[in-house]
């Protein structure tokens, strides 16, 4: 009996050491980013090295494996993020983004300005960063108010409802891309499920926009540098070619996910689908299409084209570094045997263990968002940690739902340390209190709705 008790004690002690390493790692990341305002890349690398030094393994390999994990992660997502940045910048420069917005306004009409702005934000925020989308659409909200004399707050919140949801849930925006890489989620599946979760969340956000506008009408105020009408462009591309940079990668990646299992293995069609549906190739082709459209419409000089591409790649460079550091951090947590320790703490059926992981992913992303302000950093860090905790027996449902739980959680907790908070407030002319009641509350609604839809889908469509 004594021997059995001693064995149990040793087993418990062995399980607690990885948990303590995890807690120390969280403390380092949050302390450096929030307390000392250290760049997320530096904080994650320091945390990864610390975890690697404490984890089992030969001392000669402890730093080497950090560098190897960094290279592996950068190799898996570097091209995709760089190409996504090129697509976003060139779509704005060519007028393709403006053309898509005009199409939604024309289809739904200015009398349905709220749904038109939500739909525009929803679609454009898939390839374009949120702040750029908001900057593009806010003049339309002001123009609609000038024409109707009402519903300004509804238009502003409607933009955020669409743009914020896909920013956190649908690749190829950086956060969802990293979630897919860290959790080894099929990118096409995350596009489909992410959009499925984001759509009803955005719809509820639009309803909240209408309700809040009635309860708290806000006048349109003058904002320096923001016009009340969209900036006219000399020429816009046709709608058919304007949507190619968005539609092409979605069709190629999702098409591979859907149709490849139905094709004969090693056939010409299957091999072609495998190549074209690879996320790297799909985003490269989409970037080529977007750059070609920009050249055709704007006829830039080689110098202007080079500067535009350099600008887009520089914007993606820091994201690649932070993403690779997050993947390195997750790999070192795996080396510290965090996963088996967490599995033993929540021993039971795969389904109950999976539900605990969903809740953990949502809450961890929310806490990180609240602590340091960035949804992207919250998604990178939370997915890296959760990747090391997935039970060996699986979750009882597809890991894609853990990804949408993390993405949903990263929306909750936006306040004055979030750059998005200030972009929304300053460009719309709202006060801090009005922003808390509209922006911060909206993101709670989007995040909680996304989390609940994710939970329901694990039962209705587990995809296990």
Predicted regions and their residues:
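Hydrophobic transmembrane alpha-helices of multi-pass solute/ion transporters
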Residues: 12-86, 99, 103-107, 252-325, ...
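Structural signature of hydrophobic alpha-helical transmembrane segments
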Residues: 15-22, 75-77, 132-133, 280-281, ...
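Alpha-helical transmembrane segments of multi-pass membrane proteins
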Residues: 81, 110-126, 148-168, 186-199, ...
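Membrane-core helix-loop-helix motifs of multi-pass transport proteins
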Residues: 4, 143-250, 398, 420-457
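C-terminal transmembrane helix pair
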Residues: 111, 198, 354-464
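Long, contiguous bundles of hydrophobic transmembrane helices that form the permeation core
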Residues: 2-19, 192-307, 462-464
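Membrane-embedded alpha-helical segments and adjacent helix-loop junctions characteristic
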Residues: 59-144, 299-390
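Hydrophobic core segments of alpha-helical transmembrane domains in multi-pass membrane transport
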Residues: 22-33, 45-53, 81-88, 121-124, ...
